[in-house]
Amino acid sequence: MIKTAKLPLELDTEFIQAVTDLFENKITFNQVLGMKLTEVKPDHVRARLPMRTDLIGHYAHQRIHGGVISACLDAMGGIAMMGAMGARHFDESCEQRMKRFMKLGTIDLRIDYLRPGVDTHFDLSAEVLRLGSRVGSARMEFRGSDGKLLATGTGAYIVS
């Protein structure tokens, strides 16, 4: 979690709506995946992914594809960075803060698969570990509906 007194505890509604719209509607690949944000805070985000047959990677066991897990965790790390960047630049307009997304990109991503993903839906979370002036880092989790940890990720993101 980011340790700084400069960040507000909450984000403004306009920014949260803009980030949600970006994540769920404007990033086409996220539409394909089907993730829906459930919480956007300055230091973390949460989302839900309903299981669908087109996300299956192992047909015999009905497991979610590892690439889906990886893509979802990467997207969560990126949107967590957006929340932190939005909080850091709280004095800017929503439009100015959203333009910062254009500079955001994944530098490094590591995924650890811990258990097979067989469920009706999955819960995802990401927390910002550090937000520097050029690079940020995040830790992400992919859990089953029962709360069991199925995969973890860490990511580094260019933020400027």
Q: In which residue ranges do the predicted regions lie?
A:
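Terminal targeting signals and extreme-terminal segments of soluble enzymes
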Residues: M1-S160
